[in-house]
């Protein structure tokens, strides 16, 4: 039998509302704010590289923000930020000697990938570190020093942690409610 068009519309609206209430959507909004706000403010105040470094730090810290206790989230986000900061610092100075860069990339790649044996959150921290390793060669800091760029990457991770903490205090039971509703 054919259903009425209003039945289809109400079903789609229910599905849309369920998507908008999901934790995946709220994390996407959180990452969108954490990544876009530093870029916008950096462009606005003519400090593009600082905004970009903060954006990178927030982006590379966000994968370890998965369901679990807030203590584990905090440790994962801070570990991702520290790893991205160290890798960004090392990667910033590896552009000078090719033979040195290849050996350091191999060593860092293995060491960072080895972190993933410690569990799912550790594999996401490892993913952040490997992503930071690859992308550290894509950008050359021109206006600020490499160590400053690395520090702003770490500050971007702290920025994401601050936003995640605020979001957690606004919706402390969001993940549990979604788990029980399924």
What residues fall within each predicted segment?
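A transmembrane helix-and-boundary motif of multi-pass membrane transporters/channels
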Residues: 1-182
């Amino acid at each position: 039998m054919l259903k009425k068009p209003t039945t289809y519309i109400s079903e789609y609206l229910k599905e849309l509302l369920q998507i908008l209430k999901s934790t995946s959507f709220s994390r996407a909004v959180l990452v969108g704010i954490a990544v876009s706000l530093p870029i916008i403010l950096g462009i606005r105040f003519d400090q593009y590289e600082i905004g970009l470094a903060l954006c990178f730090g927030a982006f590379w810290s966000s994968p370890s923000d998965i369901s679990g206790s807030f203590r584990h989230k905090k440790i994962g986000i801070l570990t991702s930020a520290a790893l991205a900061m160290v890798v960004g610092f090392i990667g910033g100075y590896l552009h000078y000697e090719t033979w040195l860069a290849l050996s350091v990339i191999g060593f860092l790649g293995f060491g960072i990938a080895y972190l993933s044996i410690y569990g799912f959150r550790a594999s996401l921290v490892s993913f952040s570190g490997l992503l930071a390793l690859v992308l550290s060669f894509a950008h050359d800091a021109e206006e600020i020093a490499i160590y400053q760029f690395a520090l702003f990457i770490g500050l971007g991770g702290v920025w994401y942690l601050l936003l995640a903490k605020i979001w957690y205090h606004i919706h402390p039971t969001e993940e549990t409610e979604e788990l029980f509703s399924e």
